[in-house]
């Protein structure tokens, strides 16, 4: 579930985090929440995790248990059968369009930044759109895996531009290809 809230959140609102221990071959993940819904999911060694979690309190929440079940299904080699509750703050119309396309990329498949740009251009009645702009929006994604930004590759098939690190991207794509 996406809540489009482009207003700045109350800076005093409590934020929570917990760590998900991934299977061998992947970095562990940090989950973040406002106490009700998932607000972030990143690999622990990513810059986003370091920046986003500075003042988060460790806590066990229902949304974390729900997200753990989703991650267990994912790392178990299956397309998860549900989506954990989440909210994305600061979602512009363009970012929403990009996320909508990302959410439609099936488990085990990939798209290029150009494919996504073409889909959005078509939806908006434009001749073309910048693949670089799409890359910026994909890189902005605060909830990796659930919103599958790792399934996006460069036009020449290059595995580029993944905030969770290229090693994790390679491992995720190989995991989904099995």
Language model feature labels by segment:
Residues 1-83, 154-178:
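Low-complexity, small/basic-enriched stretches
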């Amino acid at each position: 579930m996406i809540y489009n809230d482009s207003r700045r959140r109350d800076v005093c609102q409590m934020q929570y985090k917990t760590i998900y221990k991934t299977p061998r071959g992947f970095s562990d993940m940090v989950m973040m929440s406002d106490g009700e819904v998932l607000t972030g999911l990143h690999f622990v060694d990513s810059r986003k995790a370091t920046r986003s979690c500075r003042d988060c309190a460790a806590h066990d929440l229902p949304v974390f248990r729900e997200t753990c079940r989703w991650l267990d299904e994912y790392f178990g080699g299956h397309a998860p059968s549900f989506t954990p509750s989440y909210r994305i703050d600061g979602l512009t119309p363009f970012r929403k369009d990009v996320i909508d396309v990302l959410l439609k990329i099936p488990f085990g498949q990939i798209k290029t930044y150009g494919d996504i740009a073409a889909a959005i251009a078509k939806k908006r009645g434009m001749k073309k759109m910048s693949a670089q702009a799409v890359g910026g929006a994909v890189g902005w994604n605060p909830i990796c895996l659930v919103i599958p930004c790792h399934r996006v590759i460069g036009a020449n098939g290059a595995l580029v531009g993944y905030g969770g690190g290229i090693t994790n991207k390679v491992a995720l794509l190989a995991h989904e290809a099995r």
